[in-house]
Amino acid sequence: MKPEPQSEAELMERAQDIAGLSFAELAEEAGMTVPENLKRDKGWVGQLLEWHLGAPAGSKPQQDFAKLGIELKSIPIGYSGKPLETTFVSVAPLTGVQGLTWETSHVRNKLSRVLWVPVEGEREIPLAERRVGSPLIWSPDQEEEQILKNDWEELMELIVLGKFDQISARHGEALHLRPKAANAKALTEAYSSNGKPIKTLPRGFYLRTQFTEQILLKHYINAQSE
Protein backbone atom coordinates (compact mmCIF):
# COMPACT_ATOMS: atom_id res chain seq x y z
CA MET A 1 0.00 0.00 0.00
CA LYS A 2 1.15 3.54 -0.67
CA PRO A 3 2.26 5.57 2.36
CA GLU A 4 -0.35 7.61 4.21
CA PRO A 5 -0.72 11.12 2.72
CA GLN A 6 0.43 13.91 5.03
CA SER A 7 -1.90 16.65 3.77
CA GLU A 8 -5.24 17.15 2.04
CA ALA A 9 -3.41 18.52 -1.00
CA GLU A 10 -1.28 15.37 -1.24
CA LEU A 11 -4.38 13.17 -0.96
CA MET A 12 -6.16 15.12 -3.70
CA GLU A 13 -3.10 14.90 -5.93
CA ARG A 14 -3.09 11.10 -5.58
CA ALA A 15 -6.82 10.91 -6.31
CA GLN A 16 -6.32 13.05 -9.43
CA ASP A 17 -3.42 10.83 -10.52
CA ILE A 18 -5.66 7.73 -10.69
CA ALA A 19 -8.57 9.52 -12.44
CA GLY A 20 -9.13 8.01 -15.88
CA LEU A 21 -7.41 4.71 -15.05
CA SER A 22 -9.23 1.36 -15.22
CA PHE A 23 -9.72 -1.03 -12.31
CA ALA A 24 -7.50 -3.53 -14.18
CA GLU A 25 -4.62 -1.03 -14.34
CA LEU A 26 -5.02 -0.07 -10.68
CA ALA A 27 -5.36 -3.70 -9.52
CA GLU A 28 -2.23 -4.75 -11.42
CA GLU A 29 -0.15 -2.06 -9.70
CA ALA A 30 -1.60 -3.05 -6.30
CA GLY A 31 -1.07 -6.78 -6.91
CA MET A 32 -4.81 -7.42 -6.53
CA THR A 33 -7.05 -9.71 -8.57
CA VAL A 34 -10.11 -8.16 -10.20
CA PRO A 35 -13.17 -10.22 -9.18
CA GLU A 36 -15.69 -11.23 -11.83
CA ASN A 37 -18.32 -9.05 -10.17
CA LEU A 38 -18.98 -7.32 -6.85
CA LYS A 39 -21.70 -9.66 -5.54
CA ARG A 40 -19.34 -11.35 -3.10
CA ASP A 41 -16.74 -8.59 -3.03
CA LYS A 42 -18.79 -5.50 -2.23
CA GLY A 43 -15.87 -3.70 -0.60
CA TRP A 44 -13.35 -4.46 -3.35
CA VAL A 45 -13.49 -1.06 -5.09
CA GLY A 46 -13.04 0.71 -1.76
CA GLN A 47 -10.03 -1.49 -0.90
CA LEU A 48 -8.47 -0.80 -4.30
CA LEU A 49 -8.84 2.96 -3.83
CA GLU A 50 -7.57 2.76 -0.23
CA TRP A 51 -4.40 1.02 -1.47
CA HIS A 52 -3.68 3.71 -4.05
CA LEU A 53 -4.56 6.63 -1.79
CA GLY A 54 -2.72 5.29 1.27
CA ALA A 55 -5.67 4.89 3.64
CA PRO A 56 -4.84 2.92 6.81
CA ALA A 57 -6.80 -0.36 6.57
CA GLY A 58 -9.95 -1.30 8.42
CA SER A 59 -13.48 -0.06 8.93
CA LYS A 60 -13.31 2.07 12.06
CA PRO A 61 -15.57 4.65 13.71
CA GLN A 62 -13.11 7.42 12.78
CA GLN A 63 -12.54 8.62 9.24
CA ASP A 64 -10.43 6.68 6.70
CA PHE A 65 -7.78 9.41 6.88
CA ALA A 66 -8.17 10.19 10.57
CA LYS A 67 -5.05 12.38 10.76
CA LEU A 68 -6.47 14.59 8.01
CA GLY A 69 -10.08 14.30 9.21
CA ILE A 70 -11.20 12.99 5.80
CA GLU A 71 -13.50 10.10 4.90
CA LEU A 72 -13.10 8.29 1.54
CA LYS A 73 -16.25 7.40 -0.40
CA SER A 74 -16.37 5.78 -3.82
CA ILE A 75 -19.59 6.50 -5.66
CA PRO A 76 -20.75 4.37 -8.63
CA ILE A 77 -22.04 6.57 -11.45
CA GLY A 78 -24.30 5.65 -14.38
CA TYR A 79 -24.14 6.82 -17.99
CA SER A 80 -26.35 9.77 -17.03
CA GLY A 81 -23.77 10.95 -14.49
CA LYS A 82 -26.11 10.13 -11.60
CA PRO A 83 -25.21 7.95 -8.59
CA LEU A 84 -26.48 4.38 -8.99
CA GLU A 85 -26.76 3.43 -5.32
CA THR A 86 -27.05 4.85 -1.83
CA THR A 87 -23.85 5.54 0.13
CA PHE A 88 -23.20 3.72 3.42
CA VAL A 89 -22.12 6.11 6.18
CA SER A 90 -21.99 4.19 9.46
CA VAL A 91 -23.67 1.52 11.56
CA ALA A 92 -26.52 2.92 13.66
CA PRO A 93 -26.17 2.53 17.44
CA LEU A 94 -29.17 0.57 18.78
CA THR A 95 -28.18 0.42 22.46
CA GLY A 96 -26.63 3.04 24.74
CA VAL A 97 -28.33 5.73 22.68
CA GLN A 98 -29.60 7.97 25.49
CA GLY A 99 -27.88 11.34 25.42
CA LEU A 100 -26.31 10.93 21.97
CA THR A 101 -26.21 14.18 19.99
CA TRP A 102 -25.73 15.00 16.32
CA GLU A 103 -22.62 17.03 17.16
CA THR A 104 -20.82 14.00 18.62
CA SER A 105 -22.31 11.35 16.30
CA HIS A 106 -20.31 9.00 14.05
CA VAL A 107 -22.44 10.15 11.10
CA ARG A 108 -21.44 13.79 11.51
CA ASN A 109 -17.81 12.81 12.08
CA LYS A 110 -17.76 10.69 8.90
CA LEU A 111 -19.46 13.36 6.79
CA SER A 112 -17.58 16.41 8.08
CA ARG A 113 -15.06 16.14 5.21
CA VAL A 114 -15.40 13.61 2.39
CA LEU A 115 -13.22 12.74 -0.58
CA TRP A 116 -15.73 11.54 -3.18
CA VAL A 117 -14.26 9.34 -5.91
CA PRO A 118 -16.79 8.65 -8.69
CA VAL A 119 -16.34 5.32 -10.48
CA GLU A 120 -18.09 3.84 -13.51
CA GLY A 121 -20.85 1.65 -12.13
CA GLU A 122 -22.97 0.43 -15.05
CA ARG A 123 -23.25 -3.36 -14.73
CA GLU A 124 -22.74 -4.00 -18.44
CA ILE A 125 -19.20 -2.55 -18.25
CA PRO A 126 -16.90 -5.42 -17.18
CA LEU A 127 -15.42 -4.65 -13.77
CA ALA A 128 -11.83 -4.69 -15.06
CA GLU A 129 -12.70 -2.05 -17.69
CA ARG A 130 -14.49 0.38 -15.39
CA ARG A 131 -12.67 3.65 -14.84
CA VAL A 132 -12.14 6.00 -11.93
CA GLY A 133 -13.54 9.51 -12.33
CA SER A 134 -12.41 12.95 -11.24
CA PRO A 135 -12.35 13.32 -7.41
CA LEU A 136 -13.90 16.05 -5.32
CA ILE A 137 -13.50 17.11 -1.71
CA TRP A 138 -16.67 18.14 0.13
CA SER A 139 -17.91 19.39 3.47
CA PRO A 140 -21.63 19.96 4.09
CA ASP A 141 -22.70 23.58 3.83
CA GLN A 142 -25.09 25.05 6.41
CA GLU A 143 -28.22 23.89 4.58
CA GLU A 144 -26.90 20.36 3.98
CA GLU A 145 -25.76 20.05 7.60
CA GLN A 146 -29.23 21.08 8.82
CA ILE A 147 -30.93 18.48 6.59
CA LEU A 148 -28.57 15.75 7.81
CA LYS A 149 -29.03 16.78 11.45
CA ASN A 150 -32.84 16.78 11.15
CA ASP A 151 -32.82 13.33 9.54
CA TRP A 152 -30.41 11.90 12.11
CA GLU A 153 -32.41 13.29 15.04
CA GLU A 154 -35.71 11.97 13.64
CA LEU A 155 -34.27 8.48 13.06
CA MET A 156 -32.46 8.34 16.41
CA GLU A 157 -35.66 9.34 18.19
CA LEU A 158 -37.39 6.29 16.70
CA ILE A 159 -34.46 4.10 17.83
CA VAL A 160 -34.56 5.54 21.37
CA LEU A 161 -38.31 4.86 21.50
CA GLY A 162 -37.76 1.29 20.20
CA LYS A 163 -40.03 1.89 17.20
CA PHE A 164 -38.02 -0.24 14.79
CA ASP A 165 -41.14 -1.47 13.02
CA GLN A 166 -42.05 2.14 12.19
CA ILE A 167 -38.72 3.00 10.54
CA SER A 168 -39.18 2.82 6.79
CA ALA A 169 -37.20 3.91 3.74
CA ARG A 170 -39.51 6.95 3.59
CA HIS A 171 -37.94 8.51 6.69
CA GLY A 172 -35.21 11.05 6.03
CA GLU A 173 -34.65 13.54 3.24
CA ALA A 174 -30.91 12.89 2.81
CA LEU A 175 -30.17 10.17 5.34
CA HIS A 176 -32.12 6.96 5.76
CA LEU A 177 -31.82 3.87 7.89
CA ARG A 178 -32.01 0.33 6.61
CA PRO A 179 -30.94 -3.17 7.69
CA LYS A 180 -27.24 -3.85 7.18
CA ALA A 181 -26.49 -7.56 7.43
CA ALA A 182 -25.07 -10.21 5.14
CA ASN A 183 -27.95 -12.48 6.15
CA ALA A 184 -31.17 -12.34 8.15
CA LYS A 185 -29.66 -14.38 11.00
CA ALA A 186 -27.09 -11.72 11.95
CA LEU A 187 -29.14 -10.19 14.76
CA THR A 188 -28.01 -7.60 17.28
CA GLU A 189 -29.21 -6.31 20.66
CA ALA A 190 -31.77 -3.51 20.89
CA TYR A 191 -34.68 -2.39 23.06
CA SER A 192 -38.36 -2.52 22.19
CA SER A 193 -40.84 0.33 22.68
CA ASN A 194 -41.67 -1.04 26.16
CA GLY A 195 -37.96 -1.11 27.11
CA LYS A 196 -37.46 -4.88 26.87
CA PRO A 197 -34.25 -6.29 25.29
CA ILE A 198 -34.91 -7.67 21.80
CA LYS A 199 -32.92 -9.04 18.86
CA THR A 200 -33.17 -7.16 15.58
CA LEU A 201 -31.22 -6.72 12.34
CA PRO A 202 -28.29 -4.28 12.54
CA ARG A 203 -29.16 -0.98 10.87
CA GLY A 204 -26.95 1.35 8.86
CA PHE A 205 -27.20 5.03 7.95
CA TYR A 206 -27.11 5.61 4.18
CA LEU A 207 -27.12 8.76 2.06
CA ARG A 208 -29.85 8.88 -0.56
CA THR A 209 -28.82 9.10 -4.21
CA GLN A 210 -30.75 12.40 -4.61
CA PHE A 211 -28.51 13.95 -1.96
CA THR A 212 -25.21 12.67 -3.40
CA GLU A 213 -26.35 13.67 -6.89
CA GLN A 214 -26.78 17.26 -5.67
CA ILE A 215 -23.26 17.20 -4.16
CA LEU A 216 -21.81 16.12 -7.52
CA LEU A 217 -23.91 18.60 -9.50
CA LYS A 218 -22.96 21.56 -7.30
CA HIS A 219 -19.28 20.67 -7.50
CA TYR A 220 -19.11 20.19 -11.25
CA ILE A 221 -21.19 23.31 -11.97
CA ASN A 222 -18.84 25.33 -9.73
CA ALA A 223 -15.78 23.75 -11.37
CA GLN A 224 -17.04 24.71 -14.85
CA SER A 225 -17.71 28.31 -13.81
CA GLU A 226 -14.22 28.83 -12.33
Curated annotation (Swiss-Prot):
Function, as annotated, reads: Sequence-specific endonuclease that cleaves unmethylated GATC sequences. It is involved in DNA mismatch repair.
A GO cellular component annotation in the UniProt record: cytoplasm
> What does the sequence similarity comment in the record state about its family?
Belongs to the MutH family.
Chief location: cytoplasm
| Protein name listed in UniProt | DNA mismatch repair protein MutH
Q: Which Pfam families match?
A: MutH
Q: What is the annotated localization of this protein?
A: Cytoplasm
Q: Which GO molecular function annotations are given, in alphabetical order?
A: DNA binding; endonuclease activity
What's the source species' lineage? Bacteria, Pseudomonadati, Pseudomonadota, Gammaproteobacteria, Vibrionales
Sorted alphabetically, the keyword list is: Cytoplasm, DNA damage, DNA repair, Endonuclease, Hydrolase, Nuclease
Determine if Iron is one of this entry's keywords: no
GO BP annotations listed: DNA modification; mismatch repair
- Specify whether Membrane is a keyword of the entry: no
